[in-house]
Design a protein with these regions (language model features):
Chain A
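Charged, low-complexity intrinsically disordered segments
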Residues: 1-133
Length: 133, 280
């Protein structure tokens, strides 16, 4: 099988969800998609390994799911929006996950985000035309 | 005949819905973001559009990866929100206008946009949250809505240039409909953000502001970028910004900028509100 390459593949720390990922991780994403319903979330919690088997999630994919290794799942082809359906109901917010990806605490991750807004009001005033409170 | 009176942009992130549901909109973290919606809400109150066409992407509620339409149009009289696994409480169903939707679908296909038609379509936070932010939450929504979903989830996703073209075709479609309806287009999502990978937490304020200003006054500027270039700059999830171009393409080339509001960060994103009005 020959997969074409893309210039987005060299963006650092980034796993663009394309056909190659979607194809390889199809059972994993199907499992994650099932978490739209409470019934499936409960069934998974009762026996995660059996739930993986039911969806044909095997090998490294199964290992990542059982370890709740979100970066591992992502690299293996999980879609971030689908992964959130597993993470959020179990108390891992997208910011907790972001912190995990970077190996920092959620507080540190949030502080980095807040810093993006430093000086914003002055900056918008200077550009002009923006509502500014 | 139906006419497009303007366009509005809004973030659609889940945190916005949660902030509204939990009455946090006047908390220090949220206050500036939500206060900046007031002029947009007032504009909608004044104009009272009959129909809002909401351009958004589904994040895995209605569409799974088994079938992934690039562009999909709701063609139903009712659209339901549902549990999407993000701990958001589902809201009341939305009223559609099937006959108008089918007219739009016909016109788009005639104009070579071979759109997917959906007679059942669950709408997720991408559709719901802009409506809540701009109209408040209701048991009976005060406006008829038509969902227009753009795939921004699984690449290949359409280019910025193609989205702008779709908007132009959408304008032709709406303006050839015989009923006297005033229509507003919502462009949702964005601006810069990346949720995934070691680069998570990216926000590029400079790019966001440039996008807002160019989309208002010079939308062709966005079409120079490939999706790789947009993702490099605005993050993988920042690619959602292309949906603003569908809205923009549906308006006249010169528009009145009624309102421009930017805030960062909101959760993991830069967030922009534009109110653009067609000259009569
Ligand atoms: Fe989104």
């Amino acid at each position: 099988m020959t997969w074409t390459t893309h210039d987005y593949e060299n963006i650092p720390g980034t796993y663009v969800f394309d056909g190659k990922h979607s194809y390889g991780a199809y059972p994993l994403n199907k499992l994650l998609f099932s978490f739209n319903t409470e019934e499936c979330r409960t069934e998974f919690d009762a026996d995660p390994a059996a739930y993986c088997d039911k969806f044909g999630v095997e090998g490294k994919y199964k290992e990542f799911v059982l370890k709740k290794d979100f970066l591992g799942m992502l690299r293996a082809g999980a879609n971030i929006y689908f992964m959130a359906k597993m993470a959020i109901p179990r108390g891992t917010s997208v910011q907790d996950a972001g912190a995990q990806f970077q190996g920092i605490t959620t507080k540190e991750f949030q502080a980095k985000l807040l810093a993006k807004g430093d000086g914003l009001v002055e900056r918008l005033a200077k550009r002009g035309g923006y509502w500014n409170g | 005949m139906a006419k497009i009176i303007g366009g509005v942009t809004s973030s659609h992130i889940p945190a916005v819905g949660n902030a509204i549901a939990n009455n946090l909109t006047q908390e220090p973290y949220w206050k500036r973001f939500f206060d900046g919606y007031a002029p947009a809400k007032a504009w909608l109150q004044e104009k009272k559009p009959d129909v809002v066409i909401v351009v958004y992407n589904d994040h895995g509620l209605n569409f799974f990866l088994d079938k992934m339409p690039t562009f999909a149009l709701g063609c139903a009289d009712t659209y339901h929100n549902d549990d999407e696994g993000w701990a958001l409480k589902p809201v009341a169903p939305f009223k559609g206008d099937a006959a108008f939707s089918w007219h739009i679908a016909e016109s788009l296909v005639e104009q070579k946009f071979d759109i997917c038609t959906c007679q059942e379509m669950k709408v997720d936070h991408g559709f719901v949250n802009p409506i809540r932010a701009l109209y408040g939450t209701h048991d009976v929504w005060p406006v008829t809505t038509i969902p227009l979903a753009v795939n921004t989830v699984q690449h290949p996703v359409p280019t910025a240039a193609r989205c702008l073209e779709l908007g132009k075709a959408l304008r032709t479609a709406v303006e050839s409909y015989p009923a006297d309806l005033n229509v507003v287009i919502f462009g949702t999502g964005g601006l810069s953000h990346q949720l995934q990978g070691e680069r998570a937490g990216l926000i590029d304020v400079e790019f966001d502001l440039e996008c807002m200003e160019r989309i208002a006054n010079d939308p062709e500027w966005m079409t120079q970028f490939s999706n790789s270039e947009i993702m490099r700059r605005a993050g993988t999830e920042g690619i959602e910004t292309i949906m603003w171009l569908v809205m923009r393409g549906a308006l006249q080339s010169n528009v009145k900028v009624v309102h421009k509001h930017y805030h960062a960060p909101i959760s993991n994103t830069g967030a922009g509100v534009l109110v653009l009005e067609n000259y009569l």
